[in-house]
């Protein structure tokens, strides 16, 4: 009976996902983000039940222990269709897969199974030629999956931190870069890669990486296979904002720079990197033309300190992941409000007065840890969000009887319609300007 039920659930999941990704729209105005997948606990596509039991016996898999952090998707033209990738860092024991994709297989109690990416051989704990612990990923417009592997299992640095690149068409490794030990601190944890791919063939590619507990920014130059470390006071946690209250569960966490994203290209060719610390209500920014300058930082990680600027106005609460769309609209979680916020960087100054709450739900929007703006094949932009019951992990109250992890999605045009983030409806001839510290970006 259980096998038959699981088979039916798998068929239903496949049909539902097909309908969803064909049209990620929601007809209910009070439920703008549509559920794609949800889990009470993560389960994996072990080769067979004996392999699963063996993994449990030796502690490689502790049911209920794995926790997803990030999500990204890629729509293949070939036999794979759309793949939805998830990352599962090994910051605690019992995580058999650190990078995988969601399959149509479903357990008897409704949890979609996750398959290892690219395969099981890459998931061996302690194998430094494989994947050790992946926090976040990014798929660029040239079909490359960028994977930031911290090399840490729990608090132990078992392998060098490395940045890997896989081809989405062949699922093969096309590049691996191990960061020099001189750029890694004992406390370092590289958690967020932001890919800046320029040129028709993406030959000019840089990756900006947040060191959340080393309070630094790493810059990787893919063409020249080199990296450098940048230090700035704005990368640190803000002590007054180190206490988090999510659905009346309170915990402390002094994490630094974590949420990052890039603006669209400006008319003069530059882009802006927006960033914030997790323990913070402050958003900051820096022109990428500054941080891409290797000679500027090669001998002085603290160079150009005044080029990093914090907005004078703040959010109402802390935020984790964020992403910006092609119109310059920033999307981010508002942790204590259990909401997704947006800010129109083209027409408004930064600050809570101009931040819209475009989705809010105390059950489904707890701690948005992964946010991506995805451009579909027809050019339509979609917002994809991974939410987790992170506060339950921090307070030890995680329950296997409740839904703890969710992937949700929506069409951006529908999310922002009628709000300050609806750029298309705003008078493009407005003379109003949005001022970013010492930089002024006129309304386009």
Give, region by region, the residue ranges found by the protein language model:
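Beta-propeller blade signature
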Residues: 97-107, 160-172, 220-225, 399-415
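Conserved beta-strand positions in repeat-built beta-propeller and related beta-rich domains
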Residues: 82-92, 147-150, 154, 204-213, ...
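Beta-strand-rich domains and repeat architectures in extracellular enzymes and scaffolds
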Residues: 30-98, 135-136
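Beta-propeller fold detector
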Residues: 109-122, 174-180, 228-243, 293-311, ...
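Beta-rich, blade/repeat-based domains predominating
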Residues: 61-81, 125-145, 182-207, 236-272, ...
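Blade-loop segments of beta-propeller domains
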Residues: 67, 102-154, 174-183
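Short loop/turn segments immediately following beta-strands, especially the blade-tip
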Residues: 103-108, 169, 222-228, 285-300, ...
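Blade-level signature of beta-propeller repeat domains, shared across WD40, Kelch, NHL, RCC1
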Residues: 369-444
């Amino acid at each position: 009976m259980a096998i038959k039920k699981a088979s039916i659930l798998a068929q239903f999941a496949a049909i539902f996902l097909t309908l969803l990704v064909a049209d990620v729209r929601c007809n209910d105005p009070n439920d703008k983000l549509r559920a794609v997948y949800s889990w009470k606990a993560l389960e994996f596509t072990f080769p067979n039940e004996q392999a699963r039991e063996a993994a449990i016996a030796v502690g490689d898999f502790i049911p209920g222990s794995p926790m997803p952090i990030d999500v990204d998707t890629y729509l293949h033209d070939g036999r794979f269709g759309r793949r939805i990738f998830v990352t599962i860092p090994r910051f605690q024991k019992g995580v058999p897969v650190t990078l995988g994709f969601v399959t149509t297989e479903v357990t008897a109690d409704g949890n979609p199974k996750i398959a290892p990416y690219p395969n099981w051989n890459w998931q061996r704990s302690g194998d430094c030629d494989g994947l050790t612990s992946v926090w976040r990923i990014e798929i660029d417009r040239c079909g490359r999956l960028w994977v930031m592997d911290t090399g840490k299992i729990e608090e132990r640095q078992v392998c060098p931190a490395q940045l890997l690149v896989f081809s989405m068409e062949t699922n093969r490794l096309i590049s691996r870069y191990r960061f020099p030990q001189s750029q890694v601190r004992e406390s370092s944890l590289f958690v967020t890669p932001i890919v800046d791919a320029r040129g028709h063939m993406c030959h000019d590619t840089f990756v900006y990486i947040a060191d959340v507990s080393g309070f630094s920014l790493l810059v990787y130059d893919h063409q020249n296979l080199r990296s450098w470390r940048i230090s700035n006071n704005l990368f640190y946690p803000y002590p007054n904002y180190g206490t988090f209250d999510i659905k009346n569960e309170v915990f402390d966490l002094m994490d630094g720079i974590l949420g990052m994203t890039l603006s669209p290209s400006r008319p003069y060719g530059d882009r802006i990197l927006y960033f914030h610390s997790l323990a913070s209500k402050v958003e900051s920014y820096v022109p990428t033309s500054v941080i891409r300058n290797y000679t500027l930082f090669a001998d002085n990680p603290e160079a150009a300190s005044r080029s990093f600027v914090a907005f004078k106005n703040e959010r109402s609460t802390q935020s984790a992941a964020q992403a910006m769309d092609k119109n310059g609209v920033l999307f981010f979680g508002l942790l204590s409000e259990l909401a997704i916020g947006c800010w129109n960087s083209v027409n408004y100054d930064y600050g809570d007065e101009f931040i819209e709450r475009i989705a809010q739900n105390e059950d489904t929007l707890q701690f948005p840890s992964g946010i991506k703006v995805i451009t579909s094949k027809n050019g339509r932009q979609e917002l994809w969000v991974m939410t987790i019951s992170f506060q339950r992990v921090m307070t030890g109250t995680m329950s296997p009887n409740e839904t703890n992890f969710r992937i949700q999605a929506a069409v951006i045009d529908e999310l922002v319609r009628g709000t300050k983030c609806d750029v298309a409806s705003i008078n493009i001839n407005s003379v109003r300007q949005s001022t970013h510290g010492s930089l002024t970006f006129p309304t386009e």
